[in-house]
């Protein structure tokens, strides 16, 4: 079976730093530890309100990462310009609302097709690989294809938040079907949001999924076990699910 890759989201290291307005813990240091522990890439979300990751973080991480940067951002002129200046390997376009604690759902590509397509084309022309964070919905996948996005990231929040085994299995089936559908269209499929050490294996076992982006669970585990072990343990579960 094909390999699966782990992108470690380090936003919540920045959240902890910003809670006191200090210079520590530094997400740049966290990225270096995560890479040494087996992370295949580092994911960061530069929000419009800069609530965790800052422009400084983006700049230094771009200079120091040994793996690849996946820059999550809203579909705005400001963010597109920052991406063009920064030149990350990947940009993931996500929905964003100031009042939300975290990204609450997938990007409505279908409802803003021309806007997303324009951003995708601009970033692609600069050599940046674009991913669209969407729900496991065929119409949204078709819209992503129409935008020319080579990657999508399937939103796993509904799966992660399911209150019963039946609901979770239903959400898992939706994700698996969406991954297969997108793969058949020639789109590379990533997934993420709300994944934990307890629920990640079933998602990692879906053969069409290329990479999982996971942050909160890893940073939470790192408080008790250390970041290197937290990353290595998550990667081990994912790899075992592919055997």
UniProtKB/Swiss-Prot annotation:
UniProt: 3-amino-2-oxopropyl phosphate binding residues: 9, 20, 194, 215-216
EC number(s) recorded for this UniProt protein: 2.6.99.2
Marked site: Transition state stabilizer: 153
Enzyme class: transferase
Active-site residue numbers: 45 (proton acceptor), 72 (proton acceptor), 193 (proton donor)
UniProt-annotated binding residues for 1-deoxy-D-xylulose 5-phosphate: 11-12, 47, 52, 102
GO molecular function, one term: pyridoxine 5'-phosphate synthase activity
GO terms for cellular component: cytosol
A biological process from GO: pyridoxine biosynthetic process
UniProt KW Cell membrane keyword: no
Cell compartment(s), UniProt: Cytoplasm
Keywords: Cytoplasm, Pyridoxine biosynthesis, Transferase
Pathway, per record: Cofactor biosynthesis; pyridoxine 5'-phosphate biosynthesis; pyridoxine 5'-phosphate from D-erythrose 4-phosphate: step 5/5
InterPro entries: Aldolase_TIM, PyrdxlP_synth_PdxJ, Pyridoxine-5'_phos_synth
Catalytic reactions on record: 3-amino-2-oxopropyl phosphate + 1-deoxy-D-xylulose 5-phosphate = pyridoxine 5'-phosphate + phosphate + 2 H2O + H(+)
Subunit composition and interactions: Homooctamer; tetramer of dimers.
Family assignment from sequence similarity: Belongs to the PNP synthase family.
UniProt xrefs under NCBIfam families: pdxJ, PRK05265.1-1, PRK05265.1-2, PRK05265.1-3, PRK05265.1-5
Protein function: Catalyzes the complicated ring closure reaction between the two acyclic compounds 1-deoxy-D-xylulose-5-phosphate (DXP) and 3-amino-2-oxopropyl phosphate (1-amino-acetone-3-phosphate or AAP) to form pyridoxine 5'-phosphate (PNP) and inorganic phosphate.
Entry protein name: Pyridoxine 5'-phosphate synthase
Species, as recorded: Vibrio cholerae serotype O1 (strain ATCC 39315 / El Tor Inaba N16961)
